[in-house]
Amino acid sequence: MADKVQTTLLFLAVGEFSVGILGNAFIGLVNCMDWVKKRKIASIDLILTSLAISRICLLCIILLDCFTLVLYPDVYATGKEMRIIDFFWTLTNHLSIWFATCLSIYYFFKIGNFFHPLFLWMKWRIDRVISWILLGCVVLSVFISLPATENLNADFRFCVKAKRKTNLTWSCRVNKTQHASTKLFLNLATLLPFCVCLMSFFLLILSLRRHIRRMQLSATGCRDPSTEAHVRALKAVISFLLLFIAYYLSFLIATSSYFMPETELAVIFGESIALIYPSSHSFILILGNNKLRYVSLKVIWKVMSILKGRKFQQHKQI
């Protein structure tokens, strides 16, 4: 029964992986082609491209971890290759979260309507410093990933082996305290960008409320371009927050799996839920971006035209 559930979850993970690769590769390809064509890239496109690349890597690492657990359990428990996988999973995990937070911050400074001198100063300079902010996210993610992965990997693999050797059970219980502290460190590290994103969300709501009130007083209506920009930004941010909560819970399941009787099943279940976040959020970003939405509709229209042409030719031959 457990093998059937594992196979079902593995097929689900492959489907989520395929959808996520399609959406994120589309974002990266469109922005890179536009970059080559114009020989420059906008700040928003740079953030979206960085986010898409990090999520493609994250999707590949999660799926690789799933296949290794199911097909090569001995390598998963003892192989040195898993240290590399765990490091890149932790790295791409933090990169994708921090890049999404940078997107929320960028929306806040570019769309928000505040008149505080510090806000206006940052609003004017955000395009100049965004590349340095992204680089800082990379450095911070590497700094977090190196020590945390080493400790978490050693504790987790040891307890996976303890599932098969009863004489190691007591030692595994001793290591649970160290494992819990490492896990707490990783979770707190991901909560920081979540709090920053949540703050940007509430400030955008406040900005939208002030803007609508100003439009009502001037009797110009509420559906102006600034209001539309606020709404699109809020949709992107709130979708990230909700998906991140689901991803955070799945991360807790995966990292706490050796407390459970079915360790392998718990890991695959957690990872299948984790794949929802990097897979689905890319399509929300596509729908919220005018350029990406236009290109996607254009591609869909061309594909439908080709399919209709083939059906017409087949019908004509019959």
UniProtKB/Swiss-Prot annotation:
Keyword check for Ribosomal protein: no
Record topological domains on the Cytoplasmic side: 31-55, 116-128, 209-235, 288-318
Keyword check for Protein biosynthesis: no
Location in or out of the cell: Membrane
InterPro entries: GPCR_Rhodpsn_7TM, TAS2R
One example GO MF annotation: G protein-coupled receptor activity
Topology feature Extracellular, residues: 1-9, 77-94, 150-187, 257-266
Positions of glycan attachment: 167, 175
Coiled-coil parts of chain: none
Keywords: G-protein coupled receptor, Glycoprotein, Membrane, Receptor, Sensory transduction, Taste, Transducer, Transmembrane, Transmembrane helix
PROSITE patterns, per the entry: G_PROTEIN_RECEP_F1_2
Record-level GO BP terms: detection of chemical stimulus involved in sensory perception of bitter taste
Role this protein plays: Gustducin-coupled receptor implicated in the perception of bitter compounds in the oral cavity and the gastrointestinal tract. Signals through PLCB2 and the calcium-regulated cation channel TRPM5.
Similarity annotation: Belongs to the G-protein coupled receptor T2R family.
Name of protein: Taste receptor type 2 member 7
Source organism (scientific name): Gorilla gorilla gorilla (Western lowland gorilla)
Gene (name only): TAS2R7
